[in-house]
């Protein structure tokens, strides 16, 4: 779901929010940061309404969105883009491959032509290549 949202929404009709993420603009915040609200609000509503009305599937769905959001924040914002200065180095072939794949995604500065939309999935041969570099 996250892969499809990134490829077909963020690199599609919502590019006006995502574009500044592919170019380095001055300042700490990006329009891309609005996606936090776009995903956090439905997550919160699913959890809250699910608890109020006893719909466990709604709570589970909301918690799933929240868990992905937390993972995204740690991996994408902290580890990959270094928006906060910790988790800067890694000796892990997997995490180095994740960082490389994301760097290749950012080679495209337009909404068309980008590749590698997933956050955590990396082909095994990429991990092996990073292992050889270590």
Question: Model-derived features: where do they sit?
Answer:
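Cytosolic/stromal cytosol-facing helical appendages immediately following the last transmembrane segment
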Residues: 13, 19-35, 50-58, 68-134
């Amino acid at each position: 779901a996250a892969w499809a949202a990134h490829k077909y929404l963020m690199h599609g009709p919502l590019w006006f929010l995502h574009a500044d993420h592919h170019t380095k603009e001055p300042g700490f915040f990006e329009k891309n940061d609005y996606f936090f609200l776009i995903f956090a609000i439905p997550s919160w509503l699913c959890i809250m309404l699910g608890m109020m009305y006893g719909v466990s599937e709604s709570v589970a769905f909301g918690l799933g969105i929240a868990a992905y959001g937390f993972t995204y924040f740690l991996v994408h914002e902290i580890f990959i883009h270094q928006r906060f200065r910790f988790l800067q180095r890694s000796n892990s072939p997997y995490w180095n491959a994740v960082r490389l794949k994301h760097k290749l995604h950012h080679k495209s500065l337009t909404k068309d032509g980008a590749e590698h939309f997933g956050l955590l999935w990396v082909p095994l041969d990429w991990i092996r290549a990073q292992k050889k570099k270590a």
